[in-house]
Amino acid sequence: MDWAPRQIKPSIEVVDLRKDRMDFILLNSDVSTANAIRRVILSEIPSLAIEIVTVLENTSVLHDEYISHRLGLLPIDSTLASEFEFRDRCQCTDKCAKCTVDYTLDVSCNDSNSRLVTHFDIVPDDTHSKSIYGKNLPMPIPRADVTNFNGATDGIPIVKLKRGQSINMKLTASKGLGKFHAKWIVANVNYKMEPRFSFNSALMEQLSSDEKAGIAASCPRNVFKYTGVRSENPSFLGHSDKTFKLDAGGLQVVNKLECIYCDECINYCRELGHKDLIRIQPDESKFHFTIESTGSIPPEKILEIALIVLEKKLQDLQSNFTEAQSRTLGSTTTAHHREGPRAPQPSTPYIDLD
């Protein structure tokens, strides 16, 4: 059995790039590839997160477990996560600077009536070797040393202390993957297939202006707009990433990406007696992605790492198939050589991944 490679060349077009968000279009692809990219981003991107909390003192109103859970979900700068070892694969006996980062959270409220403890109060442990990473020691983000933040108002809240209360904890962060626990997930990612609209021009000519306006009003997402004026080009008025205008006797598609396939417009047309007036189908070769980073890794870097991880997985799959095929063919040849002539056997399936 031969597997012929598909003659498609996927490409990526970046639509919008911000500090913590990225919108891009995956072109000339299919659902399996789009879903693979999404799953890799959610579960296969390595990052750092607080895994162990040693409570030395806690007189706040929150239980130890509540505070530990909040600390575990704090995003930590993971741009250097690839330089760390997974703790269960490290050669050390317990933990070391190659697989963990140690922090201290020691805050007391003595002077004021209350004190809000935020992630800015977390400091590197003095016993941790800072010489390995220098100023790039992974810290909870946003980092107080590189950004202009007010620690009292802009930090991520952990717990509020009243006068006389205090907390003292030792924190240990380690490397992990999103498939192990949600605290290691680096981003939320989603995609949608681009909808394709088509109108029956013959039936559209039979509609009145009020009926066309009713079609536009039936959409809860304002995908359509009725202008009452037919354009000179009845097929396309313009094309961009988020606005696509398809004219049908004054009825235009102006926000196609807002379509949620609710079929309200189609149901309205059926009430008018024209069930085939509008057809909406997803384009299974064009996918609009949105990556919302937690801040631990920039979104463009997340996509880059995801593609590298996906490529490595495909290489491993090809290598394993080739190895299994060679092992199977080798054992068959050896058996024939030892036992002499045998009756014809069915040919071994051949899988070509090149």
Model-derived features with residue positions:
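Protein-protein interaction/assembly regions in multi-subunit complexes
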Residues: 1-354
